[in-house]
């Protein structure tokens, strides 16, 4: 859409009542975000259940903390980088086919991990899983830009990210319950049942995606013409004043030449750093306080996720109302950095340790909700995909290095103290980079209603 056409959409949008616009977006959110929420819960169960399975995998497959995390992240990361570019094809083949393919493959591969018997099979399974899952996260972020203008994006992204919290809240007790009650059922070990029962639903959900999702508002049969017009006008008004890129061959290169893309990549890298502690080490940290019952560990592991979910909703709402991103991101990150630095000094107290994990969860969920609302605010439609892809790919450095480093440090020193302190410092540095290097006037967002 041209700049003139986008500008013409603004008065059309203003002629409609605030209540009518909100009603349309509630309808869109109920339809799309319910499905995406459940899909992401199933996706993130894989990250939660591996933290509970690691005790059994180390025993049955003969791997140390360092070996388990280094090899797993190495093969996962390499194929993730290959597959991460696939989400750009979402614009060509559509969200329905893309999400269907990703979910069916990851569900089947995740369930197949129940039948691995050697470390090599574990590495292969994780590599294939990384390739299958690649593109889901950035693809969904891009998909949301087809439906929601910038002023709504942090809040709607936070609802999407609530699925991660839900996966932690559900996954901990569920994994603990399966590991407790499925010991030697039908001749299979408890961790085998966990992978099967938590993997296959994703494949089923993938098939459902083909029949349930549509690629863009124009194709939605569940919207009438006026509702479609409201959404399209809101998106057009959001694009008003942005410089269009007409040469698609150079659109991605234009995004990669923007130094703010690399600053945001550094900021995004801090999020998986926090996620490493929360998603992979929470059960271990809780067990180290003296709590050994796997079901109790699972129940207590939900506390940080609950706190993080509540904080994310409040942070995202505040950010959207004020149309301010940088400070919200920084203070979210700083809170988690403090929690990571304090955690090594309170390992004997379950209550204080869980409090520190909750602080990290606030950082993890709050920062993730904010940072993905920044790129679309200053990148036009054609370069947004390139910018989001670059940020996601470069930010995976944090996701790649953190588990390896923590695993190695824990194996060598017998403690997570040094690793947690280093992560706290890196997280704070990433937050400061976004706050200082991204100009506030670069985030050209406009409120679309009087909210």
From Swiss-Prot:
It is a multi-pass membrane protein. One of its GO terms (cellular component) is plasma membrane. GO terms for molecular function: transmembrane transporter activity. SUPFAM superfamilies: MFS general substrate transporter. Disulfide bonds: none annotated. InterPro entries: MFS, MFS_dom, MFS_trans_sf. One of its GO terms (biological process) is phthalate catabolic process. Keywords: Aromatic hydrocarbons catabolism, Cell membrane, Membrane, Plasmid, Transmembrane, Transmembrane helix, Transport. Pfam families: MFS_1 (PF07690). Pathway: Xenobiotic degradation; phthalate degradation. Signal peptide: none annotated. Gene3D superfamilies: MFS general substrate transporter like domains (1.20.1250.20). It is found in: Cell membrane. This is Phthalate transporter. The gene is pht1.
């Amino acid at each position: 859409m041209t700049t003139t056409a986008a500008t013409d959409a603004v008065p059309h949008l203003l002629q409609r009542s605030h209540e009518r616009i909100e009603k349309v977006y509630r309808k869109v959110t109920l339809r799309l975000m319910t499905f995406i929420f459940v899909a992401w819960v199933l996706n993130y169960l894989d990250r939660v259940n591996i933290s509970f399975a690691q005790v059994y995998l180390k025993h049955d497959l003969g791997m140390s903390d360092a070996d388990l995390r280094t090899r797993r992240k190495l093969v996962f990361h390499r194929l993730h980088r290959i597959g991460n570019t696939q989400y750009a094809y979402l614009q060509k083949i559509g969200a329905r086919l893309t999400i269907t393919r990703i979910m069916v493959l990851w569900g089947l591969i995740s369930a197949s991990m129940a039948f691995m018997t050697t470390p090599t099979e574990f590495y292969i399974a994780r590599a294939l899983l990384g390739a299958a899952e690649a593109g889901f996260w950035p693809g969904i972020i891009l998909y949301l830009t087809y439906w929601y203008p910038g002023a709504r994006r942090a809040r709607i992204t936070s609802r999407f990210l609530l699925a991660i919290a839900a996966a932690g809240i559900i996954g901990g007790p569920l994994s603990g319950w399966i590991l407790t009650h499925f010991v030697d059922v039908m001749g299979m070990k408890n961790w085998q049942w966990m992978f099967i029962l938590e993997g296959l639903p994703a494949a089923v959900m993938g098939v459902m995606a083909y029949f349930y999702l549509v690629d863009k508002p124009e194709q939605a049969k569940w919207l009438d013409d006026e509702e479609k017009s409201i959404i399209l006008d809101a998106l057009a008004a959001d694009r008003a004043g942005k410089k269009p890129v007409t040469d698609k061959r150079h659109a991605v290169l234009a995004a990669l030449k923007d130094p703010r893309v690399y600053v945001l990549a550094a900021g995004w890298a801090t999020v998986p750093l926090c996620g490493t502690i929360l998603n992979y080490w929470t059960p271990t940290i809780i067990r180290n306080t003296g709590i050994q019952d796997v079901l109790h560990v699972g129940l207590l592991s939900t506390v940080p996720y609950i706190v993080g979910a509540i904080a994310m909703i409040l942070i995202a709402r505040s950010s959207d109302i004020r149309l301010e991103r940088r400070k919200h991101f920084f203070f979210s990150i700083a809170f988690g950095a403090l929690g990571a630095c304090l955690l090594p000094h309170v390992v004997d107290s379950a209550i204080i340790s869980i409090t520190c994990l909750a602080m990290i969860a606030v950082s993890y969920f709050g920062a993730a909700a904010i940072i993905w609302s920044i790129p679309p605010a200053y990148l036009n439609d054609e370069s947004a995909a390139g910018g989001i892809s670059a940020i996601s790919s470069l930010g995976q450095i944090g996701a790649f290095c953190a588990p390896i480093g923590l695993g190695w440090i824990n194996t060598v020193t017998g403690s997570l103290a040094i690793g947690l302190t280093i992560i706290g410092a890196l997280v704070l540095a990433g937050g400061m980079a976004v706050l200082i290097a991204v100009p506030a006037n670069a985030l050209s967002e406009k409120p679309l209603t009087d909210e």
